[in-house]
Structure formats: structure tokens, C-alpha cells
Amino acid sequence: MANSPHGGVLKDLLAGDAPRHDELAAEAETLPAIVLSERQLCDLELIMNGGFSPLEGFMTQKDFDGVCENCRLADGHLFSMPITLDASQQVISDSNLKPGSRVTLRDFRDDRNLAILTIEEKEAKLVFGGDPEHPAIKYFNTKVEDFYIGGKIEAVNKLNHYDYVALRYSPAELRVHFDKLGWTRVVAFQTRNPMHRAHRELTVRAARARQANVLIHPVVGLTKPGDIDHFTRVRAYQALLPRYPNGMAVLGLLPLAMRMGGPREAIWHAIIRKNHGATHFIVGRDHAGPGKNSKGEEFYGPYDAQHAVEKYREELGIEVVEFQQVTYLPDTDEYKPKDEVPAGIKTLDISGTELRNRLRTGAHIPEWFSYPEVVKILLRESSPPRATQGFTIFLTGYMNSGKDAIARALQVTLNQQGGRSVTLLLGDTVRHELSSELGFSAEDRHTNVQRIAFVAGELTRAGAAVIAAPIAPYERSRKAAREAVSGLGGSFFLVHVNTPLEYCEKTDKRGIYAKARRGEIKGFTGVDDPYEAPENADLVVDVSKQSVRSIVHEIILMLESEGYFDRL
């Protein structure tokens, strides 16, 4: 029999509200609407299908405060992650939303009405401290709107999915599936990465020790920027399944938006798997860790997550399986947890960074590390040969610094090289074609650069070479552009055209600097608006000291050293 849900009752709102579907659907058409983002859709889906039981809606202030302060909902139930719905001041004002209002929650992808929220509270967004490099803090600072609105949900329609539909089990469906298979003890395994031989060995060990079966339950909602896309990962999981003994493992997909919250996230993940019927949950090394902070240090200790779930072991109601990192023993061709390996025994490991480098460069990945069928999928779909991958060259500098001339010359050189299409995004062209309505305020300049980054990222992902040459005077804009392109799997090279301002003015044949000095042009970079020199440029050049030809050659050499041209 499957594990009981967290709180004792599975809050399957879709099933509970089904008898009132026609009534709710009709009402939803008459109400003001909030169009949900991708992350909000992930949260709503797991509220409506019971994955977040005992929640029945988005948190109110008391629940939010209790969860943030001591991992407790207002009713005392353990819950470690705030689940909130944010909305802008404009949405609040336009729809006159206040406590007691009912509002439709709508899917941005197909404009379908999904649920009705009865607002219990509306509160201004709190201000949080924390390291700005943490994904959750970064999301909060850049994406979250002005207000939180909380209240109970009434389900109208389930979300439509068009990928891997047969693998998307709701908690109720997964419980029925376990019952059909006759499974009574289920070990759930959480992952946002491809699985390799070590993961197979770890999950089989856990199942063997507890006489259980395995639920491979990867996240296919929002994960960490730069992660391998879920389409590729699911194909890799499917290729791995036959490596388990027949009937031991099932693959199910979880539409979760991860927060990379380490210890708190581990507790949350355990609750979610309990709601899906699992009796055991694996928590490994650095569970849901976001990587390094702004000081280059890990946000959490490697086993902080294990300590957190151990603290609430009895209350969680799901047995947590704690594992050390496993390592390969070549002399016996087996994997063992590191704490079980005797001193002096030879071990082999490939780090995540090294694996990504090998995939990117096509270097050999040994069978002791991963299965050939998994590697084949990853190489073919997530890491094609470097010489066929796209990239973005982002030139930044003062107006008339020479970046446009460099960009045009580089475009010609890359076209002659062949092998990929080349797109040129000059600052003036983008301003005319994509951003004609924008001015030159700091926010408009930032928006302009983000539009360039969006276009560059999509083209780079498709295998093109993109040369962008805006002034891009602000560090935050350039950093966001790098993250946008890299987040889509593309390589981003920042070239600082560090031509001195005096030289730019002296060689300005159009007289634009002179107009700015006379006050005829306001907010001009270098005159009455600052240019923030890049902190982490991949290449620094100077047209006052170098020819355009030599600078283009430097860029080509940089690309060649990274493997972007065929090597015979």
C-alpha cells in the first residue's frame, strides 16, 4: 500500500472540484485574470493535483511567515518552502483585486483558464537579504512582482502537456500505478541531471537494502540555468531503464520548479514524494545545492540536506535514505559509497565539470562511468561537436570605439570560414528594428540589451554565430546577457573594446560627442552617463593601439582555442 499523504489527506483539487466543473468554468470566463508565468504554472499544477499537500492554495501571510521562520504552516504542519503567487501593482489596480475578490488563473501558453483563486490576503513583497548569486535570491530580485496574493484554489482545468504525457503521473495516478504493480515499498530518487552508472548502482543498493522498488522521479519543470534540457534527459532516463532488473524501476516526471534550496529543498522534496506514494526517499550529497556563492564558496555543506531531513525524520513520515557519494573501484569493477572504501584502494571519479567538458569537446567517456546508450544521447542531442555549435561574440564599448568596424570585419571573416550562419546585431540596427520605442534611460538601455541577448541566445542555440555590438554600458546588463545566452546552452564571449574616450571623441566624424558636450544630447554614455568597465571580459582590445585586422585575428584565435573550428 502506498504511503499516506502529508497531512493525512491528498488534496487533489482537480478530483474534488470536478462535480462543479461546468459552474466554475463559466464563472472563470467572467472574472479578471492573472496570466501565470512558467514557474507559477509549475506551482499551480502541484497544488491542484495534491503534490503540495496539505496546501490548498497559495500561501497567506501566516503560512508564509511560519514556513520562513520555522518550516511550519499556520496549522502546524511541517512545510519548508514558501509557495507564493506574485502579481504586479498594475494587475492589482486594473482588476481592483482585494481580499474577498475572485480571480481566474490563466495559462500563458494557451490562454486556458486553469483555476479560480479566492483572495484572502494581499501583501507587499517583503525584502530579503542573501547572496545575490543564489538562484532563489536572483529570481526574487529580478522576476518577482510587487505584491503577494494568497488564498484557496478551485480547480477548473488541468494543465495541457504535449511532451511525455504517458510519464506525467499525478500523485493519485502514481498511487494507483503502484497498487497495480503490487508495490508496497517504493524508494524515490530525485534528479535534475542525466543518470549514469553511479546513480543506477546507488538506487539499486537502496532498493536492495529495503526490499523495495525504485521510482525515478526527475524534475522536468524549472531547474538551474545551464542544466541539460528535460527532453534530452528523459530520453537518457528511458535508455537507462533496461539496465535495471526487470520490474524493479518506474520512470515518472515531476513538473516542479526547483528553488535550489539545499536543506529546505530536501525536506520539501521528501514531502512531495510522500504525496506521490513513495515510502522511502534518497537524499545524497549536496542535495539541491545551487553551487558556489559570490565568494566562490559552496552555499551549503555537502551533507547539510541530510542533517535537515534527519531532524524531521519522524514527522516527515517517509524513510529518508542517506547516501555518501559513490565512487568506482576499477580493480573489482564496482561502485561503493566512499565511506565504505578501505584506505589505499584505488578509486576513479569524473566530476560534473569534467563530464560537461568531455561532452562539449567529444572526449572519451568510459563505460565504467556511464552506459554507451546514455552517452550517445547526450553527445548527439545536448552536446553536438564544438565545431558545429553556435556562439555569441558580445562587443561592448563607447560609441565610436571601433566595435562596429570590428563586428563587420569579424562577420566577413566568419562567413569566409564557413560551417555556420553568421548574424550581425549592431547597436544602431537593433535600436531601429527591435527597440525603436525605447529611450535612453538606464532601464530602457537595460531592456535593449536583454532583447539583444534573447535574440542572440535563440540563434546561438540553433548553431549560429552571433556578433552583437551594443554600447551596453552597465555591468548588470552584460551579466544578464551572458546568463541569458549561457542559460540556453550557448557560449558567450565578452569582448571589451577598451578604446579610450578621448580617442573616441577625437575620431568622431559625425560630431555626436560634440553635441553631447554642448548639452544637445542628454544621457550620453561617457559624457553625462557612465560606462561601467566589464569585470570579467574574455578579451580586451583597443582600436587606438591595434588594427581592426589584428583584433579580429585575436577573436578568431580565441574561438579556435575553444574548438569552434574543425581541426584536421
Curated annotation (Swiss-Prot):
Q: Where is this region: Catalytic?
A: 163-388
A single GO BP: cysteine biosynthetic process
- Where exactly is the site Induces change in substrate recognition on ATP binding? F323
Q: What is its main location?
A: cytoplasm
Q: What is the lineage of its organism?
A: Eukaryota, Fungi, Dikarya, Ascomycota, Pezizomycotina
* Highest taxon, organism lineage: Eukaryota
Give its localization. Answer: Cytoplasm
What Enzyme Commission number(s) apply to this enzyme?
2.7.7.4
InterPro entries recorded: APS_kinase (IPR002891), ATP-Sase_PUA-like_dom (IPR025980), P-loop_NTPase (IPR027417), PUA-like_sf (IPR015947), Rossmann-like_a/b/a_fold (IPR014729), Sulf_adenylyltr_euk (IPR027535), Sulf_AdTrans/APS_kinase (IPR050512), Sulfurylase_cat_dom (IPR024951)
Q: What is this protein called?
A: Sulfate adenylyltransferase
UniProt similarity note:
In the N-terminal section; belongs to the sulfate adenylyltransferase family. In the C-terminal section; belongs to the APS kinase family.
Establish whether keyword Membrane is in the entry.
no
Query: What's in the GO CC field?
Result: cytoplasm
Q: Which reaction does it catalyse?
A: sulfate + ATP + H(+) = adenosine 5'-phosphosulfate + diphosphate
Q: Which residues form the active site?
A: T191, R192, N193
Question: What Pfam families is this protein classified in?
Answer: APS_kinase, ATP-sulfurylase, PUA_2
Site (Transition state stabilizer) at: H196, H199
- The UniProt record lists the keyword Nucleotidyltransferase: yes
The UniProt entry, under HAMAP family, shows: Sulf_adenylyltr_euk
Chain positions recorded as sulfate binding sites: Q190, R192, A288
* Positions contributing to 3'-phosphoadenylyl sulfate binding: D428, T429, V430, R431, R445, I471, A472, R510
Q: Where is this region: Allosteric regulation domain?
A: 389-568
Q: Which GO terms describe its molecular function?
A: adenylylsulfate kinase activity; ATP binding; sulfate adenylyltransferase (ATP) activity
Sum up the protein's function in the record's words: Catalyzes the first intracellular reaction of sulfate assimilation, forming adenosine-5'-phosphosulfate (APS) from inorganic sulfate and ATP. Plays an important role in sulfate activation as a component of the biosynthesis pathway of sulfur-containing amino acids.
